[in-house]
């Protein structure tokens, strides 16, 4: 299963708007994707409640994993999304 690590750029981390954008993008991939904060347990990235429950803050490292056809491309798209400070606009 491919994995990617990325530091979250949004000033407030994965809360409210950034979390919503992230989850919408995950769902649009059609793939099972997980996200974990640091060395924590992975959660289903399709659930906004689980994603927000991780309490990911600015510059926290998360690990994304996906399974299925085009998993690498989906992970790259998600990494690029998390590198953007969505709170700056």
Residue ranges and their predicted role:
Residues 1-5, 61-63:
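Intrinsic-disorder/low-complexity, polar/charged segments enriched in Ser/Thr/Lys/Arg/Asp/Glu/Gln
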Residues 53-89:
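C-terminal structural segments of small proteins and small subunits
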Residues 7-57:
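Compact, glycine-rich, soluble single-domain proteins
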């Amino acid at each position: 299963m491919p994995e990617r690590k990325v530091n979250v750029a949004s000033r407030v981390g994965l809360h409210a708007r950034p979390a919503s954008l992230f989850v919408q993008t995950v769902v649009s991939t059609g793939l099972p994707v997980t996200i974990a904060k640091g060395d924590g347990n992975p959660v289903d990235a399709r659930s906004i409640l689980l994603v927000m429950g991780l309490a990911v803050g600015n510059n926290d490292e998360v690990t994304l994993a996906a399974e299925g056809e085009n998993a690498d491309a989906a992970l790259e798209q998600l990494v690029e999304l998390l590198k953007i400070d969505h709170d700056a606009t």
